[in-house]
Amino acid sequence: MTNELINGVALADTPEKLVKAVQELALAKDVAAIPTLIAVFGYNNPTAAAIASTALVQLGEVAVPQLLTQIDDYNYGARAYSIRTLAAIADPRALDVLIDAAATDFAPSVRRAAAKGLGNLHWHKLEFPDNQTAPKKALETLLFISQDAEWSIRYAAIVGLQGLVNIPDLQQPIHTRLKEMLASDAEKAVRARILLAQSQ
């Protein structure tokens, strides 16, 4: 059954047929569909990609290894969907990929998705001492990109920092950085997002 649905995605020859085929494949909730759902990210069909991403998030942790290995280095749109999906699943195995994407990817959409994801990972799933060191690595990256020239990256860094602020060891450096940014950032939207983070 799933093979037929996978073939349906491969054979879809219009954007509308692709969306319908991906919807049907998503409903199967079958791990065998994971590679095809990830491949849909590269088909230049935002509706189909969004459906595929939602399906992968619903499958959860079982999708993470293939999401990590199938990241598209050449198509930044596909890469952004992969990063957003990993961020939504929030499995800490994605930490290094999210750090790399947030700090170095050339596509702002990829960097923003990764930055937000870094504040949202399920750290409790890590064993000691990784559950101590991993959030600090995320913090270092977010502090670094909070100085980026692009305001939307700084904004995403604040979202990520807000996600980490519940970790006691990280509260002081986060509060300090947000105060610095509130006093110095020229972008009104960034300052507004800082105030929101501080009010939570």
Swiss-Prot record:
Enzyme class: lyase
Keywords: Antenna complex, Lyase, Phycobilisome
A single cellular component GO annotation: phycobilisome
InterPro entries tied to this protein: ARM-like (IPR011989), ARM-type_fold (IPR016024)
GO-annotated molecular function: lyase activity
Assembly with partners or alone: CpcE and CpcF associate to form a lyase.
Function of the protein: Required for the chromophorylation of the CpcA gene product.
Family assignment from sequence similarity: Belongs to the CpcE/RpcE/PecE family.
Name of the molecule in the record: Phycocyanobilin lyase subunit beta
Encoding gene (name): cpcF
